[in-house]
Amino acid sequence: HKRKFLVLNMTKRSIKKSNQHFQKAIHQLPLGVTSNFRYWGDEETIYVDRASRCRIQDIDGNEYIDYRLAYGPYILGYADPRVDQAAREGMDIGGVFALSTELEYEVAQMISSMVPSAELVRFSNSGTEAVMAALRVGRAYSKRDGYIMIEGGYHGVSDSVLWDVDLDEWDPKQGDPKVQPTSHGVPSRIGEMVTLVPMNDADRLEDVLKKKHNEIGTLL
């Protein structure tokens, strides 16, 4: 949960209201937030009041430039009138259904036209779910359970991807580095399927694929 915001007003800011709200919230929400990534510390966690385009404002009135973009979905910025209008039109026809609509096909066609390798498109509600499905498809197609992750990558919060490795202390002569779960409650057996390779190390990736090609079914 590294902070990725730039405070516009570089003078010392006050987050008194956020601190007060945090003291209430921790009695109802774990860590006072709805995701561990939103927790910055007992005295540093802030709460948003409103946002527009690339700026957010906390409940103390501090303004920030936001580089997180809600972890991706708000690439066009907050309160973009085009997106908001499309959302309103979607609500007018009923919102979300347990059935398909014609628009799904139209959007899938647009995606395939922009990404020609995406011959078929399946939508998901989150990146976590998309990665879970991708791993499942990879296993089903390759008949292999093993998969590779790149050090420092983020693939959501399912048990399959909550793994890391200390590459600073790793000596390639000692074999593959031991992977460690990044959260309590992750079954250790899952780690037997995971291989992590350093970022931007094509040689190491090639070595792993040559060595474990009979085990690896998916590369994230």
Positions of predicted regions on the chain:
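Short, Lys/Arg-enriched N-terminal segments with co-localized hydrophobic residues
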Residues: H1-N9
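Active-site-adjacent loop/helix segments that line or gate small-molecule/cofactor pockets in enzymes
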Residues: T11-R50, R189
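Generic structural signal for well-ordered, non-membrane alpha-helical segments
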Residues: S14-S18, F22, D49, D80, ...
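Short, hydrophobic/aliphatic alpha-helical segments
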Residues: K16-K24, R55-N62, S112-S113
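Active-site and channel-lining beta-strand-loop segments
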Residues: T45-D66
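Glycine-rich loop-to-alpha-helix module at the N-terminal edge of alpha/beta enzyme cores
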Residues: E63-R144, I148
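PLP-dependent aspartate aminotransferase-fold enzymes
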Residues: Q109-E215
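Condensing-enzyme catalytic core of the thiolase-fold
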Residues: G217-L220
